[in-house]
Design a protein with these regions (language model features):
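Short intrinsically disordered terminal tails
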Residues: 1-4, 113-118, 134-148
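Short aromatic/hydrophobic-glycine micro-motifs
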Residues: 17-19, 85, 142
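Short Cys/His-based metal-binding microdomains
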Residues: 125-136
Length: 148
């Protein structure tokens, strides 16, 4: 299986039930090549994000136009929160900048049910923590920590 692009990972993430935008996520608006940071999420669904191209805080009426950066550490933290408290993260790198044996470094396992069974096994090996979080949510079919 070939590695997905950043945009493909983003589309998978935002398409799953339980998804919600969170301040601190690194985002990009469509064709803009530079990444900005999500600053606020309003109750009506609008989002404010810092756009480095215009060097100002913009309000987006259509957050579905935004891509998230699955390789950004702050975004990965938000994705972990969306998975909820019953997760285990496996890091197979020896050092912070080294991948695991197969070039993939992270696995995330979500546990469900009263006995704490893994939602899917085996977990998918991914090159970043954010991608591993998205893969775990995709295997589960939802973001359990994002549901009310």
């Amino acid at each position: 299986m070939s590695e997905r692009t950043t945009e493909e990972w983003s589309r998978v993430a935002v398409s799953l039930p339980g998804w919600r935008w969170m301040p601190g996520m690194r985002v990009r608006n469509g064709d803009v090549r530079q990444w900005g940071t999500l600053a606020a999420v309003h109750p009506d669904g609008h989002v404010d994000y810092w756009d480095p191209e215009f060097e100002e805080l913009l309000t987006g009426k259509h957050p579905s136009w935004l891509d998230i950066d699955p390789d950004d550490p702050a975004t990965a933290g938000c994705l972990l929160a969306l998975l909820g408290p019953k997760v285990t993260v496996y890091d197979y790198g020896d050092y912070a900048d080294e991948p695991g044996e197969n070039g993939k470094r992270f696995r995330v396992v979500v546990y469900v049910g009263s006995k704490g069974e893994p939602a899917s096994w085996p977990p998918r090996d991914c090159s970043s923590l954010g991608r591993a979080c998205i893969a775990a949510a995709e295997a589960l079919g939802r973001w359990p920590g994002g549901e009310s």
